[in-house]
Amino acid sequence: MDSCHKIDYGLYALEILAQYHNVSVNPEEIKHRFDTDGTGLGLTSWLLAAKSLELKVKQVKKTIDRLNFIFLPALVWREDGRHFILTKISKEVNRYLIFDLEQRNPRVLEQSEFEALYQGHIILITSRSSVTGKLAKFDFTWFIPAIIKYRRIFIETLVVSVFLQLFALITPLFFQVVMDKVLVHRGFSTLNVITVALSVVVVFEIILSGLRTYIFAHSTSRIDVELGAKLFRHLLALPISYFESRRVGDTVARVRELDQIRNFLTGQALTSVLDLLFSLIFFAVMWYYSPKLTLVILFSLPCYAAWSVFISPILRRRLDDKFSRNADNQSFLVESVTAINTIKAMAVSPQMTNIWDKQLAGYVAAGFKVTVLATIGQQGIQLIQKTVMIINLWLGAHLVISGDLSIGQLIAFNMLAGQIVAPVIRLAQIWQDFQQVGISVTRLGDVLNSPTESYHGKLTLPEINGDITFRNIRFRYKPDSPVILDNINLSIKQGEVIGIVGRSGSGKSTLTKLIQRFYIPENGQVLIDGHDLALADPNWLRRQVGVVLQDNVLLNRSIIDNISLANPGMSVEKVIYAAKLAGAHDFISELREGYNTIVGEQGAGLSGGQRQRIAIARALVNNPKILIFDEATSALDYESEHVIMRNMHKICKGRTVIIIAHRLSTVKNADRIIVMEKGKIVEQGKHKELLSEPESLYSYLYQLQSD
């Protein structure tokens, strides 16, 4: 209990949960306002503190089996003060992912372990933005607001559908009159009138049908544009962790599922639903003709539905398998094209071809199974339709022979029945497409339902100066992955040039990713000018941080467009100045098109060293206050590197510079050198100071390179 008084886990939990909901919180202010006796936040004071941050909170009692239905993360409250945050429940394996506030680590608990800790009290917490985001979850309900938005167009479609159904109702009556009246009484004048009337009906029916298709296609195209635009914006707003945890081909395959949704929206599915809505009117008229024949049609409808319901789960599983195999093919194809130089150099084309053939065969086999099952489904529908037709023919003929029904009425009845059965059959067949679209929506939902980097509610501060502080940083990429950074404490002053060295995997690059706010540490704070980056607007930060990586990607544009990428309206003079600092101006001037030269896809038209120098110019052109070189000169030839190092004084002037390098000669002139090993800072100092310690890791690495 003493430890609980020393550390207020309730306050720590509130800080974490508020941060999750993009709400800024000052722990000291909360403690001052609500922890009046200094013993920590009790349940009542915790709820009041959360509400003061405009969070929606509710304390409830829930049994463990009811926790599957709550909105996570939530705070599990314990009487002894050792609260913890419940973040995820895996129903399939009965495991619980929690954040242990005492250990400051995520933990995976088995059912028995969780039962031992859980006391039945849990606090649900949301914010207005969280609730809105939840309601905006992408699934089939996403289209409801879109339909409401374009309700006028859909109402027009509905009105046109009403007239089309009225025409469909009138046409059989004309045929009945011709069969029962005109042919029997030889009424040529009546025949002429009916022919003219029927011709008018047909013309209007064709016009209205085309108009309905046009209106509907126009509205669905708008929805398609909105969805496509939303998808791309959302994709670019996703955090870097989303892309690092998924294969490129898998993401591309999910985005391409938009085509399936587009085809479904612009098809006949929804118009068939509208046609089916008018079935009650047709049933009333058909009942007037013959209750017996109507009952046959009526009883056939559940048969169509039952057959579709029977086929659907099997079809969905096979469609899911087909998608997974297609995603594997996409990933392998992207990987092969990207690594084509390696494949050619290693002469492994036959092996890659064999792998592709096997994967392609699996995909084709999965597609064939889908086709076979879809064919069985369609033929089952046809069987029901033909059976109903035979029964109606037999029963209708009996009714005509017995005098209960005229020939004209039988023909009219069959035409009306066709108006009911046709949309049912179309829907039964479209149901298979609906299964495909259901999977497409689910797959696309993986993209659209993934949380983006938060920009709203974040601090947008003035121009940064360049002071950087790492305070008690502990970080890992996944809850179950090894710790990458452990208890990092480091202060970097404005204008200081820092070199970071160490073995591969020691956490050097991860440190710079935290500066760019690609990730939030699981413990501790990254501060710039005293401002916590967890509460800062990522765009505000990244616009003022220049980064050069070992492998930089150039876009398929001109050189000037690549350098001025973040500010297309930048003057040519600034672009040229940055290029000169980066040692790129001379080779650019020698190109036929100069700065207007198109670099090709990913800069394929340039050498590795040329691409790197353009990337350095791109990082410098916005005059960032913080500059990060992550193995930036390792791909340069010695002449290019000499130009960069010669200009390093100008490059570093007025900036905080962090240089990550394996080649220690690159950092020997740095103001301070940080040596990292297994996620920890083990040494720091100037070049000569570190070499003066013969047993130091830096001396060992330097000796290896000297040899």
Swiss-Prot record:
Location of the protein in the cell: Cell inner membrane
Keyword ATP-binding among record annotations: yes
Subunit-structure text: Homodimer.
Described function: Part of the ABC transporter complex HlyBD involved in hemolysin export. Transmembrane domains (TMD) form a pore in the inner membrane and the ATP-binding domain (NBD) is responsible for energy generation.
Domain of life: Bacteria
A UniProt-annotated Pfam family: ABC_tran
Name this protein carries in UniProt: Alpha-hemolysin translocation ATP-binding protein HlyB
Domain ABC transporter per the UniProt entry, residue ranges: 468-703
Record family assignment: Belongs to the ABC transporter superfamily. Protein-1 exporter (TC 3.A.1.109) family.
Residues noted as binding ATP in the record, renumbered to the chain: 502-509
Keyword line: ATP-binding, Cell inner membrane, Cell membrane, Hydrolase, Membrane, Nucleotide-binding, Plasmid, Transmembrane, Transmembrane helix, Transport
Entry-linked InterPro entries: AAA+_ATPase (IPR003593), ABC1_TM_dom (IPR011527), ABC1_TM_sf (IPR036640), ABC_transporter-like_ATP-bd (IPR003439), ABC_transporter-like_CS (IPR017871), ATPase_T1SS_HlyB (IPR010132), P-loop_NTPase (IPR027417), Peptidase_C39 (IPR005074)
GO CC terms: plasma membrane; type I protein secretion system complex
Record membrane topology: Multi-pass membrane protein
Active site: 83
Record domain ABC transmembrane type-1: where: 154-436
Database matches in PANTHER family: ATP-BINDING CASSETTE SUB-FAMILY B MEMBER 10, MITOCHONDRIAL, ATP-DEPENDENT PERMEASE MDL1, MITOCHONDRIAL
Miscellaneous comment: The complex HlyBD-TolC (OMF) forms a single transport channel across the two membranes, allowing direct export of alpha-hemolysin. This channel is involved in type 1 secretion system.
Source species of the chain: Escherichia coli
Comment on protein domains: In HlyB the peptidase C39 domain, the ATP-binding domain (NBD) and the transmembrane domain (TMD) are fused.
